[in-house]
Amino acid sequence: MSKTRVYELAKELNLSSKDLISRLNDLDIKVKNHMSTLEDEEVDLIMDLLSDKPQQTDEINQQEEDIFEDNLEDLEEERAYKKSFKKGGKKNKKNNKKVILTEEKQEDEIKIITIPEFLTVKELAEKMKVNPTEIIKKLIAKGIMVTVNQQIDFENASKIAEEYGFLVDKEEVKDELELLLEEAPDDEKDLQPRPPIVTVMGHVDHGKTSLLDAIRNTNVTMKEMGGITQHIGASVVEVNNKKIVFLDTPGHEAFTAMRARGASITDIVVLVVAADDGVMPQTVEAINHVKAANAPMIVAINKIDLPTANPDKVKTELSELGLVPEEWGGNTICVPVSAKKNIGIDNLLEMILLVAEMEDLKANPNKPARGTIIEAKLEKGKGPVATVIVQNGTLQIGDAILAGTTYGRVRAMFDDKGKRIKKAGPSTPVEVLGFSEVPEAGDKLIVVEEEKKARELAERRKELQKEMELKRKQKVSLEDLFSQIQEGSVKELNIIIKADVQGSVEALKKSIEDLSNEEVRIKVIHGAVGAITETDVMLASASNAIIIGFNVRPETNAKNLAEKEKVDIKLYRIIYDVIEDIKAAMKGLLEPKYKEVELGRAEVRAVFRVPGVGNVAGCYVLSGKILRNADVRIIRNGIVVYEGKIASLKRFKDDVREVQQGFECGIGIEKFNDIKEGDIIEAYQMEEIPR
């Protein structure tokens, strides 16, 4: 919310600052001096009140101001005269009058400086004409350790400036990076149709790769008669003199990872579902990822040549997920195909072109190129190599390029067949050589005027990246949900549910979505059975969602990724607790008492029967350490089967207090004998969270 200084409003209303302060105090708006700030609501109130007297206001204000100033002058002269009379001289009267006038002059002189979002201590000192050492001392006193050439943010710089009596304005001028990223809208007459960019998704073994091969081979048979070598992560197919670009980045993991980085290059998604298996867990995941990205979808029902194929069953399952086929009165295009027997491939390609036509995909080829990195690697003999999809403009040999924090000049380009080319227009996938470093998938590629400028901008981006890392975007979590609702930053709470059985997923989904209210809508964007995976975390990061785990645990890699991406994972064993925690978070009543600290994980390699004791697990400690007094949970195939405490911990025949990573040990679990080889024993402690 913007704030207005008293003197600024007085100037706007053609009033003196003193007169405005008096009027504000009459309205119970407490201000101290002309530098005090007013909220937008207070400014609106004053403007409304004063605008009620349009004819007389200026004259009355001027009269009041003149009378006030005359009275003030007389009063000041009288005070100065009395003071000088006491000291016995006319000279003092004159001097005191001079002092009063000087003070008035100083009050009227308001020092204003304009500073950017970030600037160095030296730059701030130069703007205020003070010694940089003094600023450094003040910053150190605030706990900010800096040197003269280090950058500080606007907030800290403005606080320092105000201590020196400066009024600070924020520089709104956009830097070159922002201006570059802001693509000017194209004139309608310059736009030309471009090929659609298609991503193929689906459950493992449902025939994604086979379908892509069938599409490519059909095209090759028509064009070249012979084999084809795939050189880059995308391929171009020509149908009826129209091109379609297929991205070969497999699975929805890459799709979501790129979306999390702001790259949305896919125009159409082809969802592959096997006619015999039907909708599977990964199919549901893929559907949820596509819905979250709001991309058009075509369903390819594959393997229709099999005797067990049942396309109607697939359509029924899709309808239950909200994808009603066109022939059943819905909007989802379903195409029966067989990648193996080459059935329905032409029909699928025609449907893709039809959807592309409906989407009216256009771009301007007559301008400097912009695109997205879809793959990047360091290749022997070539250096940093990146596969780029050109989205607008035309990329040419010799162009100076910027992508993320890397820069360079296009030295060579190769198309999807490995053929060297000199230029690439919109929707063309090309392999580009000439980068200074390996860029990241999802980085935007921009052509700039010259390589020197590209290098400067890349260095600037590196600095900004470091600064942004320090001020990393706060992901939503249950603990701070209420405050974010109050601030208005959360209008919709996205949730991902992972549970041990499908019944729990459905029960949780219904119960959680019923908690929606006027302030915040709760939306379950994905629900599935099994352990929490890296894919779940990436979807949560891209959609700013909370992950709820019910009777399941996160995989080790997923847990590490969640920490890196600042994704909140909550684990429960009772449905009631899930509902109550979300309710409490929404009301601002959530009081976390304890947090779980993972100590270590051990794998059961053998099980021994000990007379009078029961089963003892022969274990190898995979990570961390196992403590004798720790709480443990037994995890079997990603699902928690038991929670309890360690009854005994031995190394060889000796009782020990702890066993470190990389060592073997014997673990006995209290009141639990159903331990099996391959089970994971996870040791943890509960620590109280200070409030």
Swiss-Prot record:
<keyword id="KW-0963">Cytoplasm</keyword>
<dbReference type="GO" id="GO:0003743">
    <property type="term" value="F:translation initiation factor activity"/>
</dbReference>
<feature type="region of interest" description="G4">
    <location>
        <begin position="302"/>
        <end position="305"/>
    </location>
</feature>
<protein>
    <recommendedName>
        <fullName>Translation initiation factor IF-2</fullName>
    </recommendedName>
</protein>
<feature type="region of interest" description="G5">
    <location>
        <begin position="338"/>
        <end position="340"/>
    </location>
</feature>
<keyword id="KW-0396">Initiation factor</keyword>
<keyword id="KW-0547">Nucleotide-binding</keyword>
<keyword id="KW-0648">Protein biosynthesis</keyword>
<dbReference type="InterPro" id="IPR004161">
    <property type="entry name" value="EFTu-like_2"/>
</dbReference>
<dbReference type="InterPro" id="IPR053905">
    <property type="entry name" value="EF-G-like_DII"/>
</dbReference>
<dbReference type="Pfam" id="PF11987">
    <property type="entry name" value="IF-2"/>
</dbReference>
<feature type="binding site">
    <location>
        <begin position="248"/>
        <end position="252"/>
    </location>
    <ligand>
        <name>GTP</name>
    </ligand>
</feature>
<dbReference type="GO" id="GO:0005829">
    <property type="term" value="C:cytosol"/>
</dbReference>
<dbReference type="InterPro" id="IPR036925">
    <property type="entry name" value="TIF_IF2_dom3_sf"/>
</dbReference>
<keyword id="KW-0342">GTP-binding</keyword>
<dbReference type="GO" id="GO:0003924">
    <property type="term" value="F:GTPase activity"/>
</dbReference>
<feature type="region of interest" description="G3">
    <location>
        <begin position="248"/>
        <end position="251"/>
    </location>
</feature>
<dbReference type="GO" id="GO:0005525">
    <property type="term" value="F:GTP binding"/>
</dbReference>
<dbReference type="Pfam" id="PF04760">
    <property type="entry name" value="IF2_N"/>
</dbReference>
<dbReference type="InterPro" id="IPR000178">
    <property type="entry name" value="TF_IF2_bacterial-like"/>
</dbReference>
<dbReference type="InterPro" id="IPR005225">
    <property type="entry name" value="Small_GTP-bd"/>
</dbReference>
<dbReference type="Pfam" id="PF00009">
    <property type="entry name" value="GTP_EFTU"/>
</dbReference>
<dbReference type="Pfam" id="PF22042">
    <property type="entry name" value="EF-G_D2"/>
</dbReference>
<dbReference type="InterPro" id="IPR000795">
    <property type="entry name" value="T_Tr_GTP-bd_dom"/>
</dbReference>
<dbReference type="InterPro" id="IPR044145">
    <property type="entry name" value="IF2_II"/>
</dbReference>
<feature type="region of interest" description="G1">
    <location>
        <begin position="202"/>
        <end position="209"/>
    </location>
</feature>
<feature type="binding site">
    <location>
        <begin position="302"/>
        <end position="305"/>
    </location>
    <ligand>
        <name>GTP</name>
    </ligand>
</feature>
<feature type="domain" description="tr-type G">
    <location>
        <begin position="193"/>
        <end position="362"/>
    </location>
</feature>
<comment type="similarity">
    <text>Belongs to the TRAFAC class translation factor GTPase superfamily. Classic translation factor GTPase family. IF-2 subfamily.</text>
</comment>
<dbReference type="InterPro" id="IPR027417">
    <property type="entry name" value="P-loop_NTPase"/>
</dbReference>
<dbReference type="InterPro" id="IPR015760">
    <property type="entry name" value="TIF_IF2"/>
</dbReference>
<dbReference type="InterPro" id="IPR023115">
    <property type="entry name" value="TIF_IF2_dom3"/>
</dbReference>
<feature type="region of interest" description="G2">
    <location>
        <begin position="227"/>
        <end position="231"/>
    </location>
</feature>
<feature type="binding site">
    <location>
        <begin position="202"/>
        <end position="209"/>
    </location>
    <ligand>
        <name>GTP</name>
    </ligand>
</feature>
<dbReference type="InterPro" id="IPR009000">
    <property type="entry name" value="Transl_B-barrel_sf"/>
</dbReference>
<comment type="function">
    <text>One of the essential components for the initiation of protein synthesis. Protects formylmethionyl-tRNA from spontaneous hydrolysis and promotes its binding to the 30S ribosomal subunits. Also involved in the hydrolysis of GTP during the formation of the 70S ribosomal complex.</text>
</comment>
<dbReference type="InterPro" id="IPR006847">
    <property type="entry name" value="IF2_N"/>
</dbReference>
<dbReference type="Pfam" id="PF03144">
    <property type="entry name" value="GTP_EFTU_D2"/>
</dbReference>
